[in-house]
């Protein structure tokens, strides 16, 4: 019985977990994408990056993606380097 439990736990750990995250997508220079209130532009941009959806966050005038894969680049604490 214990072997079955250990084997099941080891199998789950070996498979890994594919999570999703939300955030501002960035280009190669760590700059956010400006949207100027265009939700369709942001939704298309986010879906190209394999997100579930996206919208224009109007306070920052930047695209925000929902459900991005874990390996997608999002805005962090670094500056934009144009």
From Swiss-Prot:
Q: Does the keyword Secreted apply?
A: yes
Q: Which UniProt keywords apply?
A: Disulfide bond, Ion channel impairing toxin, Neurotoxin, Secreted, Signal, Toxin, Voltage-gated sodium channel impairing toxin
Where would you say this protein principally sits, based on its record? secreted
Give expression by tissue: Expressed by the venom gland.
> What PROSITE patterns does this protein map onto?
LCN_CSAB
Q: What InterPro entries is this protein classified in? A: LCN-type_CS_alpha_beta_dom, Scorpion_toxin-like, Scorpion_toxin-like_sf, Scorpion_toxinL, Scorpion_toxinL/defensin
One BP annotation, GO: defense response
What's its job?
Answer: Alpha toxins bind voltage-independently at site-3 of sodium channels (Nav) and inhibit the inactivation of the activated channels, thereby blocking neuronal transmission.
Q: Return the domain comment text from this UniProt entry.
A: Has the structural arrangement of an alpha-helix connected to antiparallel beta-sheets by disulfide bonds (CS-alpha/beta).
**Could you identify this protein by its name?**
Toxin Pg8
């Amino acid at each position: 019985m214990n072997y079955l439990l250990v084997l099941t736990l080891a199998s789950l750990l070996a498979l890994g977990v594919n999570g999703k995250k939300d955030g501002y997508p960035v280009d190669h220079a760590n700059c956010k994408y400006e949207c100027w209130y265009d939700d369709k532009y942001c939704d298309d941009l986010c879906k190209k990056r394999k997100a579930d959806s996206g919208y224009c966050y109007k306070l920052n005038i930047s695209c925000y993606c929902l459900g991005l894969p874990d390996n997608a680049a999002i805005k962090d604490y670094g500056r934009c380097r144009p």
